[in-house]
């Protein structure tokens, strides 16, 4: 199991806008991805930063998904609220409690 951890700074006061886009887009976006498990959307309101932690069965599945047109299109909808480029890390989950 892998955690794909995406962190990005947002333009001021846009966390709720991005959260609503995520709620609207993500269910259909990952519906056909059999290796996708779950996601957590978290925010640091003081610093206008969001972190998304997505659980995938394999790192390769996420990497292929991230190349898809559907993924790129979704990221385009979010990008208008970004202050910069997202940071993406793929980490193996060693303990899950």
Annotate the PLM regions.
Residues 73-77:
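Low-complexity, intrinsically disordered Gly/Pro/Thr-rich segments
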């Amino acid at each position: 199991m892998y955690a794909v951890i995406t962190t990005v700074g947002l333009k001021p006061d846009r966390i709720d806008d991005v959260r609503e886009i995520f709620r609207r887009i993500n269910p259909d976006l990952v519906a056909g991805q059999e290796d996708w498990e779950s996601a957590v959307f978290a925010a640091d309101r003081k610093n206008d930063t969001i972190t998304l932690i997505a659980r995938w069965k394999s790192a390769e599945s996420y990497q292929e998904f991230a190349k898809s047109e559907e993924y790129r299109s979704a990221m385009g909808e979010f990008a208008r609220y970004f202050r910069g480029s997202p940071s993406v890390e793929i980490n193996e989950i060693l303990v899950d409690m």
